């Protein structure tokens, strides 16, 4: 029996607009957008929401490469060179948007990301857990061409939007 396993259903319903707005200020800037945060803080959901927002803004889905490294269907990309070659072979000369979820699973991920940024017209967004991608390492690994967005778990306001509790007294 085949069963689709989704992330926690409440997490999908919360649009993290504040984070989206902050990140999208840097859309099409020559800087790698790095989304970090503790486990289960919503980094993957936020990256999916970013993809959806780009499509809403008129970016063709064909111009967005979304790579979920948690999915075994992408296990061949654990080898960073395979991922690099795959993206390069599909590049048609127009700007593409590259989104890599859980980038730390890719060998030499920093070289892959930096090479893509240098070699093709692209806008790159990556996620990773704080345990694997530390702010202090980013500037040296990616030669300083990054901006980091620290994602926190749902706020009280966001929990109230979900109907969890009815106010500060709950």
Predicted region positions:
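Phosphate-binding site recognition
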Residues: 1-170
């Amino acid at each position: 029996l085949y069963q689709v396993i989704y992330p926690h259903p409440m997490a999908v319903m919360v649009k993290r607009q504040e984070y989206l707005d902050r990140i999208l200020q840097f859309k099409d800037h020559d800087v790698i957008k790095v989304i970090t945060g503790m486990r289960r803080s919503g980094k993957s959901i936020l990256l999916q929401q970013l993809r959806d927002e780009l499509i809403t803004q008129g970016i063709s889905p064909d111009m967005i490469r979304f790579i979920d490294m948690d999915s075994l269907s992408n296990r061949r990309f654990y080898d960073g060179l395979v991922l690099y070659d795959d993206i390069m072979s599909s590049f048609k000369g127009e700007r593409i948007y590259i989104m890599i979820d859980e980038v730390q699973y890719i060998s030499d991920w920093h070289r892959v990301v930096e090479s893509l940024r240098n070699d093709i017209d692209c806008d790159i967004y990556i996620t990773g857990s704080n345990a694997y991608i530390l702010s202090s390492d980013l500037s040296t690994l990616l030669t300083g061409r990054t901006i980091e967005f620290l994602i926190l778990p749902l706020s009280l306001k966001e929990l109230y939007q979900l109907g969890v509790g009815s106010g500060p007294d709950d």
